[in-house]
Amino acid sequence: PGPSAEDLEAPDDPGEDLLGLLTDPAWVYRQYDHQVLNNTLVAPGAGDAAVMRIKGTTKGIALTVDVNPLACYLDPYVGGALAVIEAARNISCVGATPLAITDCLNFGNPERPEVAYQLTEAIRGMADACRELELPVISGNVSLYNESQDTAIYPTPTVGMVGLIDNVDHKIGSGFVGEGDQIFLVGTESLESDVTSLGGSTYLSAIHGKINGGPRLDFALEKKVQKFIRDASSKGLISSAHDVSEGGLIVAIAESCVIGDIGAALNEDLSEIGSLDACLFAEAPARIVVSVSKTLSNEFESLALNSQI
């Protein structure tokens, strides 16, 4: 079962909870040289996927690696599917079209029935997601028997994905860009307000020490939202795009502020929201935080309306 209002106290200081969820992995990935041959246009950490140009053309390739082990632990099928879906969402967020995946399946001892179940269901979820997105699996490997003291790791079906941008002039980063740009939440008509939507979230695990509930999945909505982001990017309508994933909406917004070195003013009235922590920290899928120049906001909204977003 998922969390209930009785399980969780209202956050005393959402700002402190936000700081508890923000991390800085830069000390790891910045040890590596991303500029070999001077082809990197969006470095790791600057966008939801890295982007490299293809010299002599207008095209570029986008690369990302994704998985949420907690989601896979709670629901191996949905978690496996979401690993593919989130990778595609991240590829789309830089303006690229997903092309293919590779995978690395990391699990415990498959001789244990529960691990065999996790492995089978995660693969089934990944396969269904690949069929939905029409993506081939071009390579992969498996790492099993990952245990210590008879305790298996969380199921971790890691997905690497490559995508293509036809015109690298339309690439997008995750950071907010210009003062006065407008911020949109794409993929939903309302903010999360039900405490049960916190099920399977990083917030529930890291702040409250609870692991329950389960991740959600909507193939049709994901495909529609991702296509819209790619269309808007190709028309040059988007300044930045960052998907809502681990940590929820407020973490995605904060990360866009940090990456872009610019603040954000949010004027949404939350006084009547059912659950403030669900609004801020729920990880409902198919949501993307987008910033758009004021001069382009009407065209962006018109495209969203025509795309039934």
In which residue ranges do the predicted regions lie?
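Glycine/proline-enriched, intrinsically flexible loops and inter-domain linkers
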Residues: P1-I309
